[in-house]
């Protein structure tokens, strides 16, 4: 079978080594004669999986001891509700920075539970889409927290700055599409959450990192399954967790550690992004409309000079083993998602195809 490179934005490509191990263990895991999908989440075998996954995740991100790590249901959208329901406390407003589609989605959900103070950080610089630097973000004095999304998968926009708003500002961030792709200073945040289906594992699992002093503030109406304190008190097993997703994510964490950890992923991701953006920037046939300072290294949207060629580009790229390159309906064009599991070889195959396609159709 020819090599396939999956550029899907999520559910995304998983490391080949992880899929191979999961395949080998699928019907007989740990010598039990059953699949990991069939064992009790409260049995000692799966408890070991859960504990190792949390330890490895903490190691990868250097999570401080005063932070809890929760393995949850509900995806990023579930956390759009969980964040205000858990950390508003007795306040009624929170700061929300709007830099793209997912930030706006979080704002829409938050309006059910509080009055968001929305700061529109989107700007245009020399005709390109960009984001105002953090020093220009206008935060309110009475907000319970400030929320933003460091990487917008649809817009292809990234905010790589580290928050520095003072110790009294609780920062909540949606890291779904950039978690584990670069080092982050967890201590600068109150809450970090990430859906698993991009850089962690398969869909169905969400990881939350929450500073322990923020526990115990949940609104009385907060569903128990979203209550950080209840999840923490029950070892993320208040109800049956998505065990297979948890197991596979644990394998991904071990793969990351065996391949140099987050620091090495950071280097490789930079190489991949530079290669792809380099082809786009050195061409009149392709374009990307995001300012260089805010370009995402995870999600690279691009357009062809002649949109009439879009269909042919997608057909020929798919035939060449380059899958899931169609852009989101909101933006159009193409989008290459190049998360940790995408090897440099895959991006090289894409750029070679792009150069050849331009030669034939430019």
From Swiss-Prot:
Catalytic class of the enzyme: transferase
GO molecular function, one term: O-phospho-L-serine:2-oxoglutarate aminotransferase activity
Example of a GO biological process term: L-serine biosynthetic process
EC assignment: 2.6.1.52
Keyword flag Aminoacyl-tRNA synthetase: no
Cofactor binding notes: Binds 1 pyridoxal phosphate per subunit.
Superkingdom field: Bacteria
Classification via InterPro entries: Aminotrans_V_dom, Aminotrans_V_PyrdxlP_BS, Pser_aminoTfrase, PyrdxlP-dep_Trfase, PyrdxlP-dep_Trfase_major, PyrdxlP-dep_Trfase_small
Reactions catalysed, as given in the entry: O-phospho-L-serine + 2-oxoglutarate = 3-phosphooxypyruvate + L-glutamate; 4-(phosphooxy)-L-threonine + 2-oxoglutarate = (R)-3-hydroxy-2-oxo-4-phosphooxybutanoate + L-glutamate
Pathway info: Amino-acid biosynthesis; L-serine biosynthesis; L-serine from 3-phospho-D-glycerate: step 2/3; Cofactor biosynthesis; pyridoxine 5'-phosphate biosynthesis; pyridoxine 5'-phosphate from D-erythrose 4-phosphate: step 3/5
Location in the cell: Cytoplasm
Gene Ontology terms: cellular component: cytoplasm
Cofactor(s) the record lists: pyridoxal 5'-phosphate
Keywords: Amino-acid biosynthesis, Aminotransferase, Cytoplasm, Pyridoxal phosphate, Pyridoxine biosynthesis, Serine biosynthesis, Transferase
N6-(pyridoxal phosphate)lysine: residues bearing it: 198
Listed NCBIfam families: PRK05355.1, serC_1
Family: Belongs to the class-V pyridoxal-phosphate-dependent aminotransferase family. SerC subfamily.
Protein's recorded name: Phosphoserine aminotransferase
Species this chain originates from: Shigella dysenteriae serotype 1 (strain Sd197)
UniProt lineage: Bacteria, Pseudomonadati, Pseudomonadota, Gammaproteobacteria, Enterobacterales
Recorded name of the encoding gene: serC
């Amino acid at each position: 079978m020819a090599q396939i490179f999956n550029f899907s934005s999520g559910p995304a490509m998983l490391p080949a080594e992880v899929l191979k191990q999961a395949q080998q263990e699928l019907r007989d895991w740990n010598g039990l004669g059953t699949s990991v999908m069939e064992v009790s989440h409260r049995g000692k075998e799966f408890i070991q999986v859960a504990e190792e996954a949390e330890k490895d995740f903490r190691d990868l991100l250097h999570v401080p001891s005063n932070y809890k790590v929760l393995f949850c249901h509900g995806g990023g959208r579930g956390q759009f509700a969980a964040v205000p329901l858990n950390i508003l406390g007795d306040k009624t407003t929170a700061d929300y920075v709007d830099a793209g589609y997912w930030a706006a989605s979080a704002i829409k959900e938050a309006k059910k539970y509080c009055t968001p103070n929305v700061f529109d950080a989107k700007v245009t610089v020399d005709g390109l889409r960009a984001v105002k630097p953090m020093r220009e973000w206008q935060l309110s004095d009475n907000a319970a927290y400030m929320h933003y999304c460091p990487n917008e998968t649809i817009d292809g926009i990234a905010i790589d700055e580290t928050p520095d708003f003072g110790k009294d500002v609780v920062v909540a961030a949606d890291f779904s599409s950039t978690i584990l792709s670069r080092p982050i200073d967890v201590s600068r945040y109150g809450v970090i959450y990430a859906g698993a289906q991009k850089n962690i594992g398969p869909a169905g699992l969400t990881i939350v990192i929450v500073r322990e002093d923020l526990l115990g503030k949940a609104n009385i109406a907060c569903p128990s399954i979203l209550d950080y304190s209840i999840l923490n008190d029950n070892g993320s097993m208040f109800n049956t967790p998505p065990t297979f997703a948890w197991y596979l994510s644990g394998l991904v964490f071990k793969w990351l550690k065996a391949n140099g950890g987050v620091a090495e992923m950071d280097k490789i991701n930079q190489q991949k992004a530079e290669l792809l953006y380099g082809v786009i920037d050195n061409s009149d046939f392709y374009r990307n409309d995001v300012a260089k300072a805010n370009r995402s290294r995870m999600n690279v949207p691009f357009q062809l000079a002649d949109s009439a060629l879009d269909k042919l580009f997608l057909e020929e790229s798919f035939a060449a083993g380059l899958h899931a390159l169609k852009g989101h309906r909101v933006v159009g064009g193409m989008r290459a998602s190049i998360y940790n599991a995408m090897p440099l070889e895959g991006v090289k195959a894409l750029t070679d195809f792009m150069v050849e396609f331009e030669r034939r159709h430019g």
